[in-house]
């Protein structure tokens, strides 16, 4: 199936997907803990009958049961060597069931391992895992791909890149979101939509997370940004436990009624996930068959993103600053740190610039004495783990830009692409492949343009070439190419002409670097500020500048105010209030006469009495935590004081931010690992007697369940709080859990389960513990677990996440 054919199919929709596979196979006898793909191949008639029933119910696209048939998952069952054979046979089963009446989508999902820097799996290794599976299923005759039930945007990116590098089949991608509207990693539906459609996905959506009613709002949000069709595949409500059996209570008619609302909200591809049956799909098909199809946006919005934040660029919106500080040019201290492999200054520069109002951060690692590509990649990992601002990738080397774009977990900006043949011919296809925006630098092989007319001709040429290869005007920001007025008295005027031309004639946003305009002049800040305010009035959209220069930033806020831009009055007042609070009782110097800015490293200042150790944990500064701990020890603080007065309060604050959805899984893990480093350093210095040792806790993922991301985080957090944690791993029998708890005299047993099919193994542990006289408190958690389930099976408590688990354990042991 071609992408054009897929697009036409949806235009004639709504397109009906199938319903649940797993929950229906369990009803048919699939045991807990087996490899689903292997069981299906051993019981093919059950799978074929289920999918035949879906086709009879009106399904247009069947999901082949290749869901977890990737190398990493199959290896857990000792079946990795059978990957090709199994995937081919599974595709063939669905083709047999479809009988040409429905398309067959090769189904792919997450591997269960976390990507670096949160986990140990490297991005390129994950791409290879997906490529291996994609190659087989494409060759086996799959009509299209679906990448579903994803929690990590970066894993989605890896899958889409892998599939696009293997074949040209259409790709649908759907993520699963928490009740707060974000993934476990903090990505919202709008950000996921922008990133994945820019990367080349053919449909974007949501599956599994909730029942159909709760999917309406995320679908509406996606529809505001989507230039591709939207997919919705809800559960038949949320899972409930009745007499030890997981049930979904949304009936087929109610499901179909809600399905109509999803189509009205913008979904043009719709089906069912957990708990749905052919009856649900039949009712859904009947309910939506005559409904008009939502038409995606025909014009893209100019948007950059990180993994957790979206920044929209509009021609008449508020002025933006691209932070320029992460660049070693002229910064001797930064150069020295980079040569040593340290990114402490880079991390602090990122934090400072975000705090000072930068909307985007430029990242440049161009210097001698380092591996620039390796340093650029490491910097992207560090900065994206530290701040939420989207990044601007700045390098003179094509291969470095491509390497950075490949691993960047969002939609980045390239700085820059000119009309120089080497740059334009190589970088435009790279920008298109990775869905990036780019700054158009109006230079050619002949050098600088002689006048505005030549400059404008270069802009048009590059723009037309970008459109020719599949990009759009909305992917472009034009650099005004600022020259110094010392060499060209008309330099500023020519820039103003370019800004006006781009905005009014081409409808393109503009950017520039400010400092060139005043090169060689005294008191340059006045010239730069005057140039900026006039440039904004002529249509300048953003500038690459230092956001800590208050005179410049204040002028930008004031310019927006005078141009009556949206909420500019509120933004200006908030800015002035922030500065008044910052400088309360101090003398303000907006324009220092002398400034060695190139070598200044801002040190994290204490906030509300917070120590540098506290701040290092709060910000996840793994590179700086030990230095601060050593300083504290040298100043006379005792190891237990460092833990009790700095580390514990800091991780408590991280937990508060996590509860408020201001921090997400990446920040939580980064802070926890930072604290772990500090504790491991000071622990040998502690003088503890046995009475001071905290209790022992046995933690395990229950039998039949091979998911351990959440469990691993719980282990990390409990250890950081001083507990002696025995981690038994995943797929652990009840007998081993209870036996270990008795042997180690554990005060608490912690149980994890991701799947509804393995929830009841928790009850097995509770009952066996009672039978064996084990008086350990039992706490449980997992995606499908709730308080009522904990009460029903007789557990002592339920925790919704790792931070909550620490509080629960503390409370239970105080009783």
Identify the role of each PLM range:
Residues 1-479, 483-815:
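Domain-level signal for soluble alpha/beta catalytic cores
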């Amino acid at each position: 199936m071609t992408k054009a054919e897929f697009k036409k199919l949806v235009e004639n929709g709504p397109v009906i997907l199938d319903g649940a596979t797993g929950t229906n196979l369990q009803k048919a006898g699939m045991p807990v803990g087996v490899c689903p793909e292997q069981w299906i191949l051993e019981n093919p008639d059950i799978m074929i009958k289920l999918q035949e029933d879906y086709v009879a119910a009106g399904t247009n696209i069947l999901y082949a049961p290749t869901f977890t048939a990737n190398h990493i998952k199959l290896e857990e069952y000792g079946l990795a060597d059978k990957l090709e054979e199994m995937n081919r046979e599974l595709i063939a089963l669905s083709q047999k069931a479809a009988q040409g009446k429905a398309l067959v989508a090769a189904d792919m999902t997450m591997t269960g391992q976390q990507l670096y820097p949160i986990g140990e799996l490297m991005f390129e290794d994950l791409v290879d895992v997906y490529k291996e599976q994609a190659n087989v299923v494409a060759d086996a005759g799959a009509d299209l791909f679906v990448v579903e039930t994803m929690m990590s945007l970066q894993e989605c990116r890896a899958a889409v890149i892998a599939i696009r590098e293997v074949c040209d089949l259409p790709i649908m991608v759907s993520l699963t979101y928490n009740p707060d509207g974000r993934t476990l990693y903090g990505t919202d539906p709008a950000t996921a939509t922008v990133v994945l459609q820019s990367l080349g996905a053919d449909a974007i959506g949501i599956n599994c997370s909730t029942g159909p009613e709760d999917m309406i709002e995320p679908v509406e949000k996606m529809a505001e940004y989507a230039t591709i069709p939207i997919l919705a595949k809800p559960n038949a409500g949320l899972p409930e436990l009745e007499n030890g059996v997981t049930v979904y209570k949304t009936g087929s008619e109610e499901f179909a009624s809600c399905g109509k609302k999803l189509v009205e909200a913008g979904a043009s591809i719709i089906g069912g996930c957990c708990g749905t049956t052919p009856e649900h799909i039949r009712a859904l098909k009947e309910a939506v068959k005559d409904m008009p199809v939502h038409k995606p946006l025909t014009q893209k919005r100019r948007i950059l993103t990180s993994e957790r934040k979206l920044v929209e660029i509009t021609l008449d919106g508020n002025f933006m600053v691209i932070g320029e500080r992460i660049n070693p040019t002229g910064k001797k201290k930064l150069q020295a740190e980079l040569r040593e492999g340290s990114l402490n200054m880079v991390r602090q520069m990122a934090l400072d610039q975000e705090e000072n109002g930068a909307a985007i951060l430029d990242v440049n690692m161009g210097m001698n004495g380092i591996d620039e590509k390796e340093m650029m990649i490491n910097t992207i990992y560090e900065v994206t783990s530290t701040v939420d601002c989207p990044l601007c990738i700045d390098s003179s080397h094509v291969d470095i830009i491509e390497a950075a774009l490949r691993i960047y977990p969002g939609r980045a900006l390239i700085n820059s692409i000119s009309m120089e043949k080497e740059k334009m011919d190589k970088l435009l296809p790279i920008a298109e492949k990775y869905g990036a925006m780019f700054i158009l630098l109006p230079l050619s092989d002949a050098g600088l343009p002689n006048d505005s007319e030549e400059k404008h001709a270069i802009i048009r040429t590059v723009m037309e070439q970008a459109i020719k290869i599949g990009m759009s005007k909305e992917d472009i920001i034009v650099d005004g190419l600022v020259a110094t007025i010392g060499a060209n008295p008309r330099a500023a005027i020519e820039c103003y002409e370019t800004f006006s031309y781009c905005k009014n004639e081409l409808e393109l946003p503009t950017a520039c670097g400010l400092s060139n305009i005043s090169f060689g002049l005294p008191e340059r800040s006045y010239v730069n500020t005057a140039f900026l305010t006039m440039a904004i009035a002529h249509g300048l959209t953003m500038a690459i500048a230092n956001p800590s220069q208050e005179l410049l930033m204040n002028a930008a806020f004031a310019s927006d105010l005078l141009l009556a831009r949206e909420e500019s009055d509120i933004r200006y007042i908030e800015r002035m209030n922030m500065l008044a609070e910052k400088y309360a009782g101090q003398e303000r110097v907006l324009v220092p006469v002398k400034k060695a800015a190139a070598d200044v490293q801002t040190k994290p200042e204490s906030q509300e009495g917070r120590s540098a150790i506290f701040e290092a944990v709060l910000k996840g500064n793994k590179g700086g935590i030990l230095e601060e701990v050593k300083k504290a020890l040298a100043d006379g603080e005792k190891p237990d004081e460092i833990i009790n007065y700095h580390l514990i309060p800091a991780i408590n604050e991280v937990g508060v931010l996590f509860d408020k959805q201001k921090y997400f899984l990446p920040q939580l893990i980064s802070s926890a690992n930072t604290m772990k480093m500090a504790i491991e350093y000071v622990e040998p210095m502690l003088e503890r007697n046995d009475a001071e040792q905290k209790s022992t806790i046995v933690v395990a993922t229950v039998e039949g369940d091979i998911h351990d991301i959440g469990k691993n985080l719980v282990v990390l957090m409990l250890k950081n709080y001083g507990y002696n944690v025995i981690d038994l791993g995943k797929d652990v029998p009840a007998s081993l859990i209870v036996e270990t708890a008795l042997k180690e005299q554990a005060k608490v047993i912690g149980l994890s389960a991701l799947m509804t099919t393995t929830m009841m193994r928790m009850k097995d542990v509770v009952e066996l513990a009672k039978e064996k006289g084990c008086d350990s408190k039992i706490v449980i958690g997992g995606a499908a677990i709730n308080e009522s389930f904990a009460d029903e099976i007789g557990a002592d408590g339920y925790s919704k996440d790792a931070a909550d688990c620490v509080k629960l354990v503390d409370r239970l042991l105080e009783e």
